[in-house]
Design a protein with these regions (language model features):
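Conserved nucleotide-binding/hydrolysis micro-motifs of P-loop NTPases
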Residues: 1, 21-24, 34-36, 41-46, ...
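The conserved phosphate-sensing helix
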Residues: 84-85, 95-110, 119-123, 140-144, ...
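Short amphipathic alpha-helical elements of helix-turn-helix/winged-helix folds
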Residues: 112, 150-154, 168
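Winged-helix-like regulatory helical subdomains adjacent to P-loop NTPase cores
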Residues: 126, 130-159
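Short acidic, hydrophobic short linear motifs in intrinsically disordered regions
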Residues: 156-169
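Short amphipathic alpha-helical interaction segments
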Residues: 170-186
Length: 187
């Protein structure tokens, strides 16, 4: 795929090979000028030539609690959901610095509030919903806690490789690298 993207990025054209053998020929399709924006959580999987073709690179950081609180308020407003401000503060604290998680937790808390309460997000309702989800006061879920417990107890605090931890937990190492470690390393 990268081989098709390079000439598109540099020369605004794409070459396609049609047929094979002595009947093969190349068709060149011109492209209108464009801006390519890419996003990944796994930049290391891109080849170095591909990474260096992007003129500007940025790394996104975790959101702080006030911004997550605003995101939670916006989600509640879009869902036409009543809430106590303190309930959303609790939710923002447990959102792992990620707005997409904030949105997911708002929806889960809404579902819980509609079934188990009066539909309003209160501190007690959000607390109960997050407890049901297995999310503790630090925003850690069951996998996070198992990960930390494995390093602390099974491997006596380390050092230990990710493959060994993954095998012990019965999880894929990619899951631990992509889901668990980024938050734990910045928390």
């Amino acid at each position: 795929v990268e081989e098709y993207i390079y000439p598109a990025m540099e020369d605004y054209k794409v070459d396609f090979v049609v047929d094979s053998g002595m009947h093969s020929r190349t068709i060149q399709l011109p492209l209108k000028p464009f801006t390519l924006i890419g996003a990944t959580t796994r930049a290391g999987l891109l080849s170095p030539p591909m990474r260096t073709r992007f003129g500007i690179t940025h790394s996104l950081k975790f959101w702080d609690e006030p911004d997550l609180l605003l995101r939670a308020e916006m989600s509640c407003d879009m869902l036409e959901l009543d809430y106590e401000p303190e309930a959303l503060t609790l939710l923002a604290k447990r959102s792992r610095g990620t707005p997409r998680i904030t949105n997911r937790l708002v929806r889960r808390c809404r579902d819980f509030a509609q079934v188990k309460a009066d539909g309003v997000l209160t501190v007690s309702t959000v607390g109960a919903a997050l407890e049901l989800e297995g999310i503790d006061k630090l925003g850690l879920d069951d996998l996070d806690r198992r990960f930390l417990r494995t390093i602390a107890t099974t491997y006596r605090g380390g050092p230990v490789g990710i493959e060994a931890v993954a095998a012990t937990l019965g999880e894929e190492s990619d899951t631990l690298v992509d889901v668990v470690e980024p938050y734990l390393l910045q928390a």
